[in-house]
């Protein structure tokens, strides 16, 4: 038996999931102490409830994917609209360093996946499937490569395993980012900032998700218009480039379109973009997207994972936490920005870029802004990382072919 939630039902439940997350994080000290994002808390609890329901009578639940996709695109578009070219240029050396670190993580994930699977006596392709293809790559990349695994290595249930591995990574990417940041902050003895201080419009978007904003009806309408135009252009470019060398995920086109539109308006037409409205709409899009993504998790699919693959994934989670603490944090300067970047790296290193942003928001809402982190992570996680992952996966495939 299967039940599909309508658009309105999905939106209503996602909103309740977020409110549940806010309620629990505010009242349960351990969740607040370790900076666990509210959508992860609420969404995971609902996912567990649906798992119990599924075990009782076998009912599966489906949610409106169009709403989830739209909220994701709104979020990435708002990231683009919040970026000035002058800020992008400032990314400079730290951006290159973080990109190199992200590539190093991909290499490490694949080495650990292959080595662990061989030590456990299973086909090394299973270890590779529990590596960067599903962790750094996420559900989309994992599902896209699953057929290749099935045909090239004759793996049984490759698609199901890929989705389950990506689900595992998404959950733990949202869980370990906060504790990693907490551990590093304790080293620095970083104090909290008040949560309800007002911030002005020149503050970077997304860094203060709980702070008050000054928004007018006009600024909100102008921002909705900008986002709508960017979504339209991004979707058009996605359709036009499909099957070509320029093919990219839709959200990347929307992000780049947002950057172009923002800088044309700011630098040519001298239009003052309402950062506060972009911030609010982007944060709302991110929260609703994550809530739907988390409550859509079919946790019973994890039960289908072989114990050997689960062991490989557990090793990957420990490796990600250690990598963020000893590599990402140190390479990015061992300062507060490096702490926030480390939390974000846990998010997209195991899950997805929205999870990374949620991890960073959970930190910055309590300990202060990090302009560098909110500039670098979306750029690397949303675009560059997929290209690097694809290139390194081809090398890993060749290695598995030799070892198999």
From Swiss-Prot:
Alphabetically, the GO molecular function entries are:
glutamate:sodium symporter activity
What's in the GO CC field?
plasma membrane
What transmembrane ranges does the database entry give?
Answer: 5-25, 33-53, 69-89, 95-115, 161-181, 219-239, 245-265, 277-297, 307-327, 338-358, 373-393
Top-rank taxon: Bacteria
Query: Has keyword Iron?
Result: no
HAMAP family the UniProt entry points to? GltS
What name has this protein been given in UniProt? Answer: Sodium/glutamate symporter
């Amino acid at each position: 038996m299967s039940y599909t939630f309508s658009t309105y039902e999905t939106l209503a439940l996602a909103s309740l999931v977020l409110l549940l997350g806010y309620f629990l994080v505010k009242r349960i000290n351990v969740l607040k102490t370790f900076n666990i994002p509210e959508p992860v808390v609420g969404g995971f609890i609902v996912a567990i409830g649906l798992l119990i329901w599924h075990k009782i009578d076998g009912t599966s639940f489906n949610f409106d994917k169009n709403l989830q996709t739209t909220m994701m695109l709104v979020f990435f578009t708002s990231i683009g609209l919040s970026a000035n070219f002058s800020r992008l240029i400032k990314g400079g050396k730290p951006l290159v360093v973080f990109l190199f670190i992200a590539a190093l993580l991909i290499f490490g994930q694949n080495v650990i996946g292959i080595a662990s699977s061989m030590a456990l006596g299973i086909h090394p392709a299973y270890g590779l499937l529990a590596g960067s293809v599903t962790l750094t790559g996420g559900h989309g990349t994992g599902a896209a490569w699953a057929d290749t695994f099935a045909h090239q290595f004759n793996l049984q249930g490759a698609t199901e395993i890929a989705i389950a591995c990506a689900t595992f990574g998404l959950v733990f990417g949202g869980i370990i980012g906060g504790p990693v940041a907490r551990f590093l902050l304790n080293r620095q003895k970083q104090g909290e900032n008040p949560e309800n201080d007002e911030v002005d419009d020149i503050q970077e978007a997304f860094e203060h998700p709980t702070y008050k904003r000054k928004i007018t009806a006009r600024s909100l309408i102008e921002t909705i218009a900008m986002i709508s135009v960017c979504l339209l252009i991004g979707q058009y470019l996605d359709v036009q480039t499909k099957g070509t060398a320029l093919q990219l995920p839709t959200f990347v086109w929307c992000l780049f379109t947002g950057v172009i539109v923002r800088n044309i308006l700011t630098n040519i037409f001298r239009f003052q973009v309402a950062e506060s409205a972009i911030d609010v709409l982007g944060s709302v899009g991110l929260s609703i997207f994550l809530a739907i993504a988390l409550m859509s998790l079919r946790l019973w699919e994890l039960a289908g994972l072989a114990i050997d693959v689960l062991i490989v994934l557990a090793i990957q989670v420990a490796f990600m936490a250690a990598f963020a603490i000893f590599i990402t944090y140190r390479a990015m300067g061992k300062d507060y920005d490096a702490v926030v970047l480390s939390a974000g790296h846990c998010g997209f290193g195991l899950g997805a870029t929205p999870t990374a942003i949620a991890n960073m928001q959970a930190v910055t809402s309590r300990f202060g802004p990090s302009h560098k982190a909110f500039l670098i992570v979306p750029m690397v996680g949303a675009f560059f990382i997929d290209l690097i992952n694809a290139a390194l996966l081809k090398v890993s495939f060749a290695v598995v072919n030799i070892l198999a």
